[in-house]
């Protein structure tokens, strides 16, 4: 199935109509931006992370997003994840920092095996570290420019999930199809939280329709918002903080006409 602007628009409209509640266990650095971008898309965020409340909270949502930037909240991720798995909710894992921390990598792999996520989304270095069970960089930024797409497909097939590697080109696979998304802008790598925001947006899209096509549509949607924000930033002579605000703006201002920029292919 090809990813058209009409398909993306249908998903976006459905999100705005249904206002799905997305449970995000994410890090303190990006929690505000993650909540705001979900609101901009028409979804409803809840950022609960106490282990004594997350099971009750996640039971009333459409999707759960577990961000390993919040590794201290691992117990909460595990508890919420088990409930989400039992209820058939979409579960997204963002393996922040697994490329530079063996502890995070081991805990992430355990979580994958225990809660059966719908989707894993990370940068190239994080995805490679998960697949190869080794450190690939120091810190959380991606140093990789290339990735073995066949290895990604095999990993996704083994764990019955959608795997997304975000970078200059986003690679999306469910173990069968492999989609390449070429939307996006270099400024997205210059702000903290663009990856975290992408992951919570996947919560909104996959919580509305759980499919690899929906995941690819989300990647295009986020990338297009980045392109439009970059153009506005350049036009006003703004910097990175201006770009961040325009980025969230463009999510709320998205139209089907703008979605015609979609560059996704198999």
PLM region descriptions:
Residues 151-156, 211-226, 247-248:
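Short, well-structured alpha-helical segments that form the helix of a local strand-helix-strand
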Residues 129, 190-220:
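Short, small-residue alpha-helix embedded
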Residues 182-192:
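Short pre-catalytic strand/loop immediately N-terminal to key active-site residues, enriched for Gly-Thr
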Residues 3-6, 224-266:
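Charged C-terminal helix
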Residues 37, 41-87, 93:
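Active-site cofactor/substrate anionic-group-binding motifs, chiefly glycine-
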Residues 1-44:
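Glycine-rich phosphate/adenosyl-contacting loop at the front of the ribokinase-like
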Residues 76-122:
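Glycine/small-residue-rich loop that forms an oxyanion/phosphate-binding "nest" at active or ligand-binding sites
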Residues 104-178:
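Conserved phosphate/ATP/ADP-binding segment of small-molecule kinases
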């Amino acid at each position: 199935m090809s990813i058209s602007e009409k398909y993306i628009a249908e998903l976006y409209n459905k999100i705005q109509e249904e206002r799905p509640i997305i449970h995000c266990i994410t890090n303190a650095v990006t929690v505000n931006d993650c909540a705001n971008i979900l609101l901009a898309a028409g979804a409803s965020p809840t950022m609960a992370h106490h282990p004594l409340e997350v099971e009750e909270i996640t039971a009333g949502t459409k999707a759960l997003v577990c961000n390993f930037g919040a590794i201290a909240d691992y117990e909460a991720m595990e508890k919420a994840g088990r409930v989400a798995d039992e209820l058939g909710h979409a579960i997204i894992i963002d393996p922040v920092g697994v490329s530079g921390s063996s502890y995070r990598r081991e805990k992430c792999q355990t979580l994958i095996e225990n809660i059966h996520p719908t989707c894993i989304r990370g940068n190239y270095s994080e995805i490679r570290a998960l697949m190869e069970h080794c450190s690939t960089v120091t810190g959380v930024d991606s140093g990789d420019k290339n990735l073995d797409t066949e290895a990604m497909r095999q990993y996704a097939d083994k764990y019955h999930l959608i795997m997304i590697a975000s970078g200059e080109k986003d690679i999306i696979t469910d173990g069968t199809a492999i989609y390449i998304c070429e939307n996006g802008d270099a400024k997205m790598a210059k702000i903290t939280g663009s990856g975290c925001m992408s992951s919570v947006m996947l919560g909104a899209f996959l919580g509305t329709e759980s499919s690899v096509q929906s995941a690819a549509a989300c990647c295009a949607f986020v990338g297009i918002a980045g392109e439009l924000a970059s153009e506005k930033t350049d036009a006003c002579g703004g910097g990175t903080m201006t770009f961040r605000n325009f980025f969230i703006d463009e999510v709320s201002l998205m139209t089907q006409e703008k979605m015609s920029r979609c560059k996704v292919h198999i």
